[in-house]
């Protein structure tokens, strides 16, 4: 399953409701972006990060 490297955000599940309040299952997927970052040792690592975390954090991208 796709998961954010920073926040741990994954797919959420719930119901879609019609006007008659019938319930059918649906999913909300996180806006994950694949980026390359440097870790503590200076090695380049490819990870998936949510767009919200990408805006908030100051990561050293490659």
UniProtKB/Swiss-Prot annotation:
Provide the alphabetized UniProt keywords.
Ribonucleoprotein, Ribosomal protein
Q: Which InterPro entries match?
A: Bacterial_rp_bL28, Ribosomal_bL28, Ribosomal_bL28/bL31-like_sf, Ribosomal_bL28_bact-type, Ribosomal_bL28_sf
Does the keyword Ribonucleoprotein belong to this entry?
Answer: yes
Q: Mind telling me which Pfam families this protein's record contains?
A: Ribosomal_L28 (PF00830)
Q: Name one GO molecular function term.
A: structural constituent of ribosome
Q: Which GO terms describe its biological process?
A: translation
Is Ribosomal protein included in the keywords of this UniProt record? yes
Q: Name one GO cellular component term.
A: ribonucleoprotein complex
Concerning HAMAP family, the annotation shows:
Ribosomal_bL28 (MF_00373)
Please state which protein family the record places this protein in: Belongs to the bacterial ribosomal protein bL28 family.
UniProt-recorded name of the protein: Large ribosomal subunit protein bL28
Question: Source gene?
Answer: rpmB
């Amino acid at each position: 399953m796709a998961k954010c490297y920073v926040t741990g955000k994954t797919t959420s599940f719930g119901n879609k409701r019609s006007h008659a309040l019938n319930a059918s299952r649906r999913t909300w997927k996180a806006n994950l972006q694949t980026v390359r970052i440097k870790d503590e040792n200076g090695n380049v690592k490819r990870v998936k990060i949510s767009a919200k975390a990408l805006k908030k954090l100051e990561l050293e991208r490659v």
